[in-house]
Regions:
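Soluble FAD-dependent oxygen oxidases
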Residues: 1-264
Length: 264
């Protein structure tokens, strides 16, 4: 099989600002105002596209991390630092393109281990109009406080997206989530992985759906064996066209996984 890849490239950025804000809390409910402020920032329609950010909820606090592709002066002039939480531990690294890649590689290296670790995960994608209100965020974070997690190794990642990816029409490629500006992924890790941990992740997802009833879909590749209608969740409105292509080019379904497009 021969496949052509057509890529549109851009010059590498000259400067990169990597930032980390560590926030310590005694309870998840204390974290809600900080998450609300972060959500307000990443959902701004005129947000500088050079900015990327992740909010990570953890048992003892939160971590806000990301990159700004520009100089420190441009980062400050954007007004973004004024929206970010004023954590006790603030860490800013000024680097270049290669340095930012090395930093990302170093962070990825921290995840590598020779010990297999069972985990359970859920995820969901949000358009701007799907995002929860401050009141619903407060209720959601208070709910987390009251739950038995079954493991100390759990975390919930809120990952800002959008920007130039949304300039491409939604039906131009297989990727259907160009109107989304946020993904969340929740994880529980355990040796062994207890039912209580799975229940916590599953029920948190249910609480999110209750707070954001119009949110639908998730990023292709976020594997979830319990996902309802995975093909529709992954490919959304593009699924009929992908089913047509699948029928022509892979009628025997040789390229198959539980979430892949099926032959119809």
């Amino acid at each position: 099989m021969v496949t052509d890849f057509v890529l549109q490239t851009h010059p590498e950025p000259g400067n990169v600002v990597h930032y980390e804000y560590a926030l310590a809390f005694g309870s998840q409910s204390e974290m809600a105002p900080y998450y609300t402020a972060w959500q307000n920032l990443i959902s701004k329609p005129d947000l500088d596209r050079r900015f990327g950010s992740i909010f990570i909820m953890m048992p003892l606090g939160a971590l806000v991390v990301g990159d700004f592709y520009g100089t420190e002066a441009e980062f400050e002039a954007s007004g973004i630092p004024g929206w970010l939480p004023k954590g006790e531990h603030r860490h800013i690294v000024l680097t270049d393109w290669l340095g930012s890649l090395a930093n990302s590689a170093q962070n990825e290296g921290l995840y590598l281990t020779n010990l297999p670790a069972p985990f359970y995960a859920k995820s969901l994608a949000f358009r701007r109009e799907d995002l929860p209100s401050p009141e619903k965020i407060d209720r959601l974070f208070r709910w987390v406080d009251m739950q038995h997690k079954g493991t100390p190794l759990w975390f919930i990642i809120f990952d800002a997206t959008g920007g130039a990816i949304g300039d491409v029409p939604g039906n131009a490629t297989a990727f259907a989530h160009r109107d989304k500006i946020l993904y969340y992924q929740s994880y529980a890790v355990g040796l062994p992985l207890l039912k209580a941990s799975k229940d916590f992740i599953t029920n948190f997802h249910g609480q999110v759906l209750e707070a954001c009833p119009t949110a639908f879909g998730t990023y292709p590749g976020y594997v979830d064996p319990a996902l309802v209608e995975p093909q529709r969740q992954y490919w959304d409105a593009n699924l009929p066209e992908l089913e047509r292509v699948k029928k022509v080019w892979d009628p025997m379904d040789r390229f198959h996984n539980p979430g892949s497009v099926l032959v119809k």
